[in-house]
Curated annotation (Swiss-Prot):
It is found in: Cytoplasm. One of its GO terms (biological process) is pyrimidine nucleotide metabolic process. It comes from the Bacteria. It comes from Fervidobacterium nodosum (strain ATCC 35602 / DSM 5306 / Rt17-B1). The keyword Transferase applies. HAMAP family: Cytidyl_kinase_type1. GO terms for molecular function: ATP binding; CMP kinase activity; dCMP kinase activity. Belongs to the cytidylate kinase family. Type 1 subfamily. GO terms for cellular component: cytosol. ATP binds at residues 9-17. It catalyses: CMP + ATP = CDP + ADP; dCMP + ATP = dCDP + ADP. This is Cytidylate kinase. Its EC number is 2.7.4.25. Keywords: ATP-binding, Cytoplasm, Kinase, Nucleotide-binding, Transferase.
Length: 219
């Protein structure tokens, strides 16, 4: 039996760190779908295409995104940390509201998640990409906590950032992600919500692992 784990939640809720650790501890594949939206958003912005442009579908037909090992490739070129900036996150949110972008990436994500045990994280994993997931988790935390986490993460990478600006961006992304017409950020009816505001990463991971071991019958 394949063990499929969906981890959804807003920006800065800890999805990426938690999902990576769970995949590592279980020895199964990991997919960061948010990275794909960052890749596409940054690319489309770089070539001057607006988020609501009617030409996006034609452009995406010539775009090739691959996930090999633990790395992403855009048109044959390995993608680096440029997709981890706050600006790339904003582009991801803006272009994700375009139905053509979501259709393009959802198709790729569904293919990656099929016929394997995997931990996939994003904003619509449990509702759209992997509705048949064995375990669905929805992580939440206050905007202030999420902004602080993102601030510390980016500072550790020697990026010049402002906490106030990150908080503003997170609140804007929450609004965009929750209110978009296509695949908005919503908790799946059968997802288990975990508030990570006052929990360490290790505590969140252990909580989820307990659920996974029971649902996936892992000893």
């Amino acid at each position: 039996m394949h063990c499929k784990i969906a981890i959804d939640g807003p920006a800065g809720s800890g999805k990426t760190t938690v999902a990576k650790l769970i995949a590592q501890k279980l020895g199964i594949d990991y997919l960061d779908t948010g990275a794909m939206y960052r890749i596409v958003g940054l690319y489309l912005h770089s070539i001057g295409v607006e988020p609501k442009s009617t030409s996006i579908k034609d452009i995406l037909e010539k775009v090739n995104i691959e996930y090999i090992g633990k790395d992403y490739y855009l048109n044959g070129k390995k993608v680096g940390d440029e997709i981890r900036t706050p600006e790339a996150g904003m582009f991801a949110s803006q272009y994700a509201a375009n139905p053509e972008v979501r259709e393009f990436l959802t198709k790729i994500q569904k293919q990656i998640c099929s016929n394997r045990s995997i931990v996939a994280e994003g904003r619509d994993i449990g509702t759209v990409v992997m509705p048949d997931a064995t375990v669905k988790i929805f992580l939440v935390a206050s905007p202030e906590v999420r902004a602080r986490r993102r601030y510390e993460e980016l500072k550790s990478k020697n990026m010049e950032v402002s906490y106030e600006e990150l908080l503003r961006q997170i609140e804007e992304r929450d609004k965009n992600d929750s209110n978009r017409d296509v695949a908005p950020l919503v908790k799946a009816p059968d997802a288990i919500e975990i508030d990570t505001s006052n929990l360490s990463i290790e505590e969140v991971v252990e909580k989820i692992l307990d659920i996974v071991k029971e649902r996936c019958r892992i000893k």
